[in-house]
């Protein structure tokens, strides 16, 4: 997939951890994002994606949940399935 010049340096604050290569960890496929309880609509947070330019990337799917306690209110409580 395409990589931006700062791909490996992009960071997303999740709880107290800075996650390197956050796009590959926290931004797999925005269409698969659901609330942590498994119900509700599949809704990517547009301003969060725009902030980190994630919409341009399509990294491999990841089952890692990186959003518990994220510092973005509209991103909190979401997991990637």
Curated annotation (Swiss-Prot):
Q: Principal place where this protein is found? A: secreted
Any GO molecular function:
hormone activity
Compartments it resides in: Secreted
Query: Which keywords label this protein?
Result: Disulfide bond, Glycoprotein, Hormone, Secreted
What cellular component terms from Gene Ontology apply here?
extracellular region
Entry-linked PROSITE patterns: INSULIN
| Short name of one Pfam family | Insulin
- Please report which protein family the annotation says this sequence is part of: Belongs to the insulin family.
Q: What's the stated role of this polypeptide?
A: Uncertain.
Q: What protein name does the entry list?
A: Relaxin-like protein AGF
What organism is the protein native to?
A: Hypanus sabinus
């Amino acid at each position: 997939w395409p990589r931006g010049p700062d791909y490996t340096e992009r960071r997303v604050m999740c709880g107290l951890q800075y996650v390197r290569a956050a796009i590959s960890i926290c931004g797999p496929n925005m269409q698969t994002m659901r609330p942590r309880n498994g119900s509700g609509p599949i809704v990517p947070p547009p301003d969060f994606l725009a902030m980190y330019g994630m919409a341009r990337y399509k990294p491999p799917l990841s089952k890692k949940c990186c959003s518990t306690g994220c510092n973005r209110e509209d991103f909190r409580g979401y997991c990637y399935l």
